[in-house]
Amino acid sequence: MSGSTLFSIGEALIDMIPSKVGCSFAEVPSFSPRTGGAPANVCAAFTRLGGKSTFLSQLGDDPFGHKIARELEACGIDLSHLAFTDKANTALAFVSLEEDGNRTFSFYRKPSADLLYAPEQIDPAWFREAFALHFCSVSLVDSPMRHAHLAAITAAREAGSIVSFDPNLRFPLWPDRAMLREAVLQFMLLANILKISDEELEFLTGTADIEAALPQLFVGDVQLVLYTCG
């Protein structure tokens, strides 16, 4: 591991934030567009802490895609490997907020530009600069982007980089929960660091007993589990 840059691969999208809390999508008066996507957010947070980050993804060659790129660049994120396409639009996620802070998502992403990001667009030489590669499960649906993840993870591991995985489960994006669980368990084997919530832990292991569930996550190359409650 010779690099000093955090690489992150996956989705960047527009979160449509409701103007009113505690009502259904149909009752929300209006929505405001905000740049989001967990892999992009990780880059932004790391850069704000003084680190260097590079984001690997693809956006639509549309107003929302260019808005995202401008805002990520303003955060100091390296976008030299970010692609644009006119084959699909930038993903949108409409958000409904409940009074207790819980969120419901409705995604417009069938497919979106990020899902068309192909393994051929990944250059293994990039990862000489990476000390770590981070990814989530939102882009692991059956698509070119899933295979791009495998290419990036393989290159990062061969370069000696740390691989970090946050499942960040979004059930509405998958045909069924069994397919999501299978994908997460497959990619979990390739990670060194796993970040997981209490809800995700129960979904993946089948038990809410923390002492029984957490040891089940130390599979493959997993060496560190970050467990969050709530």
Task: Outline where the language-model segments fall.
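Glycine-rich phosphate/adenosyl-contacting loop at the front of the ribokinase-like
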Residues: 1-78, 117
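Structural motif
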Residues: 5-7, 131-132, 224
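Anion (oxyanion) recognition and catalysis
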Residues: 47, 73, 154-158, 188
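Glycine-centered short loops/turns at secondary-structure junctions
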Residues: 50, 76, 158-160, 221
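Conserved N-terminal subdomain of the carbohydrate kinase-like
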Residues: 52-135
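Active-site beta-loop-alpha junctions enriched in small/polar residues
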Residues: 110, 138, 168-172, 199, ...
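Conserved phosphate/ATP/ADP-binding segment of small-molecule kinases
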Residues: 159, 173-230
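Short beta-strand/loop segments at the ligand-binding rim of alpha/beta enzyme cores
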Residues: 160-167
